[in-house]
A protein has these predicted regions:
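Glycine-aromatic micro-motifs
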Residues: 1-126
Length: 126
C-alpha cells in the first residue's frame, strides 16, 4: 500500500499527498502483500496522492503492474492497484511491510484497527 509518506517520497519524490480517506464497501486483506476485496460492511483506509507520469511508472514497477497488480479507476480519476487473478489465499505480511503501512496510517490519521483486523484474518487463515 502506498500509505507511507517516507516510502512514497523515496519512490515518487514529486508525489503530493492529498490526505487519507476511507473507501466504502471495501476491506483490506493480506496475501503476503496488501490487497482489498468488496465488503459492504467495511471501509478501506487509503491515502490519495497527486502523482506525475514518472511517478506512475515507478509505482507500476513497484506494484508489478500488469502482472501482479492491475490499475483500477475509482471515483472518476482516482487510481488504485488491485491484485490480479483469483487472488489466492490470505497470507501474513512481513513485519517490515506491516510496520511501513502502520506508519502510513499514523502519518495520515487513519484508524489502524483495519490494518490489525486484516493481519489477524491472514494469520487465522494461515
Amino acid at each position: 500500500m502506498n500509505t507511507n509518506r517516507d516510502a512514497m517520497a523515496a519512490r515518487c519524490p514529486k508525489a503530493k499527498p492529498l490526505g487519507g480517506f476511507y473507501l466504502p464497501d471495501h476491506r483490506l486483506t493480506f496475501r503476503g502483500v496488501a490487497d482489498f476485496r468488496y465488503d459492504s460492511d467495511m471501509v478501506l483506509p487509503v491515502v490519495l496522492w497527486e502523482i506525475t507520469h514518472d511517478c506512475l511508472r515507478a509505482l507500476d514497477r513497484l506494484e508489478g503492474y500488469p502482472t501482479l497488480y492491475d490499475r483500477r479507476k475509482i471515483n472518476g480519476d482516482w487510481l488504485i492497484y488491485d491484485m490480479n487473478g483469483n487472488k489466492g489465499a490470505l497470507g501474513t505480511p512481513s513485519s517490515g511491510y506491516y510496520d511501513m503501512i502502520e506508519q502510513g496510517y499514523k502519518d495520515f490519521g487513519l484508524d489502524d484497527w483495519y490494518l490489525r483486523a486484516a493481519a489477524k484474518d491472514a494469520e487465522l487463515a494461515a
